[in-house]
């Protein structure tokens, strides 16, 4: 009898382990990056009290853990279960939308971003990603509206400014696009992606020397940018400067570009 009583006393903490205790343990595991353990504990808490009003947050936390573990489908399911309880949570909608985009489920992501914008019309993340989706669909008028909403709140927003430049290019407003591009470069003079983008625009507009100058600026900042050497080779080849083109292509090969990718271009350099 004494032994039974001792076992009963020792087991009290386990038996009395509450929903809140398990949730706290799960959160501690998240902080320690013990994600497998955190996932197990969140599931345990959800089974303990399936009707608890806090389960929306638990499903959301579970989804975030699963996202970090690379379990995208399970994370989407967890966020969906959370949204079944709290359908107007913009944070959960944004988290699920990002995963839908990752899975290339564009229409589902679009609907989530629309729902966020209905709730928070000035939400920058939703506006930017919806604009991106509109761009993919070639719905340029709608994309411009979203980018402009972002710029009304954040006039220096780089992503929105790039979006407007791309729209101007697609709609034939080349001077407007180039003016905006020049301003962007002046604001971000060491951003290689922006310099590379301007070089591409300059080349398309027949400004080969300006493009080559920008590519050289990129290579000063990032000497191992193989794509710049490929582009330099393409420009030189177009200019009939075969020796310079070959030199650029050979440098790209040294930096890891496959010979098969450049084989035809190298033939044209002979």
Where are the regions that the model predicts?
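Canonical tetratricopeptide repeat
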Residues: 57-61, 95, 129, 163, ...
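Terminal, low-structured helical/coil segments at or just beyond the last alpha-helical repeat
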Residues: 19, 230, 234, 238-270
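Register position in tetratricopeptide repeats
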Residues: 31-32, 65-68, 102-103, 136-137, ...
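Helix-start (N-cap) detector for alpha-helical repeat units in TPR-like alpha-solenoids
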Residues: 19-20, 53-57, 90-91, 124-125, ...
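Structural marker of alpha-solenoid helical repeat scaffolds
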Residues: 48-51, 85, 119, 153, ...
């Amino acid at each position: 009898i004494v032994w039974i009583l001792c076992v009963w006393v020792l087991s009290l903490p386990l038996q009395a382990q509450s929903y809140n205790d398990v949730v706290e343990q799960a959160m501690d595991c998240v902080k320690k990056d013990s994600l497998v353990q955190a996932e197990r504990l969140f599931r345990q808490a959800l089974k303990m009290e399936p009707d608890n009003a806090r389960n929306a947050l638990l499903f959301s936390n579970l989804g975030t853990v699963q996202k970090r573990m690379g379990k995208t489908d399970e994370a989407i399911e967890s966020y969906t279960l959370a949204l079944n309880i709290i359908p107007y949570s913009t944070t959960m909608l944004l988290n699920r939308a990002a995963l839908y985009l990752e899975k290339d489920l564009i229409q589902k992501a679009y609907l989530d971003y629309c729902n966020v914008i209905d709730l928070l019309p000035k939400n920058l993340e939703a506006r930017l990603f919806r604009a991106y989706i509109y761009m993919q669909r070639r719905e340029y008028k709608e994309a411009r509206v979203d980018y402009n909403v972002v710029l009304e709140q954040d006039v220096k927003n780089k992503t929105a400014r790039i979006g407007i430049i791309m729209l101007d290019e697609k709609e034939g407003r080349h001077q407007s696009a180039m003016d905006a591009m020049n301003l962007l470069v002046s604001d971000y003079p060491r951003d290689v992606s922006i310099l590379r983008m301007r070089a591409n625009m300059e080349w398309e507009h027949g400004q080969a020397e300006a493009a080559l100058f920008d590519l050289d600026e990129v290579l000063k900042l990032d000497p191992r940018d193989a794509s710049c050497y490929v582009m330099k080779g393409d420009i030189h080849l177009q200019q009939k400067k075969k020796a310079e083109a070959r030199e650029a292509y050979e440098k790209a090969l040294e930096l890891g570009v496959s010979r098969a990718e450049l084989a035809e271009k190298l033939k044209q350099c002979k």
